[in-house]
């Protein structure tokens, strides 16, 4: 799915560019925006906001989109 790939790559780019601490925070903001445009994403967005590492966030995106 192209949308899933774009979102995953965007999250990875945020982590790579901003580093772990800021990258995780910025990824939360962007996932919240993406969530407004995805079906059945409320629980995913809520869970994503509790994640504290890039690895957890990347795994969550993969799991949500079944990548």
PLM feature segments, named:
Residues 1-67:
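Alpha/beta catalytic cores of nucleotide-metabolism and tRNA/nucleoside-modifying enzymes
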